[in-house]
Amino acid sequence: MSSIKKESSSGSENTGPSVFLSEIIGSSVTVRLHNGVEYLGNLQSIDGYMNIVLDETKEFVGGDQARNYGDVFIRGNNVLYISEA
């Protein structure tokens, strides 16, 4: 019989996405939408529906910067992913 070993990372807890997102509020993030558009800005707020508010936001279309915005509200159902920049 073969034995299966479970690896555990010492000192780290298994946390969900809501914990991660609450920890990065105020940080610079990249938000990619399903249509390929990306926004780079400071995460101000996020709710349970993944609705996002960014500040000092830059919009990138096809990898090129398209526009600069102050505040941006992004509806959660458009979000593909959020990453810390």
Swiss-Prot record:
Q: Which UniProt keywords apply?
A: Cytoplasm, mRNA processing, mRNA splicing, Nucleus, Ribonucleoprotein, RNA-binding, rRNA processing, Spliceosome, tRNA processing
Q: Please give the superkingdom of this protein's source.
A: Eukaryota
A Pfam family hit: LSM
What InterPro entries does this protein's entry cite? Lsm6/sSmF (IPR016487), LSM_dom_sf (IPR010920), Sm (IPR047575), Sm_dom_euk/arc (IPR001163)
**SMART domains in the cross-refs:** Sm
The protein's matches in Gene3D superfamilies, at most eight in alphabetical order, are given as: 2.30.30.100
Q: Where is the Sm domain?
A: 16-85
Leader peptide range in chain numbering: none
What Gene Ontology biological process does one annotation of this record name?
A: tRNA processing
A Gene Ontology term for the protein's cellular component: spliceosomal complex
Where does the protein principally reside? cytoplasm
MF terms per GO, please?
A: RNA binding
The record's function comment reads: Component of LSm protein complexes, which are involved in RNA processing and may function in a chaperone-like manner, facilitating the efficient association of RNA processing factors with their substrates. Component of the cytoplasmic LSM1-LSM7 complex, which is thought to be involved in mRNA degradation by activating the decapping step in the 5'-to-3' mRNA decay pathway. Component of the nuclear LSM2-LSM8 complex, which is involved in splicing of nuclear mRNAs.
Its family remark reads: Belongs to the snRNP Sm proteins family. SmF/LSm6 subfamily.
Oligomeric state and partners? Answer: Component of the heptameric LSM1-LSM7 complex, which consists of LSM1, LSM2, LSM3, LSM4, LSM5, LSM6 and LSM7. Component of the heptameric LSM2-LSM8 complex, which consists of LSM2, LSM3, LSM4, LSM5, LSM6, LSM7 and LSM8. The LSm subunits form a seven-membered ring structure with a doughnut shape.
> Mind telling me what this protein is named?
U6 snRNA-associated Sm-like protein LSm6
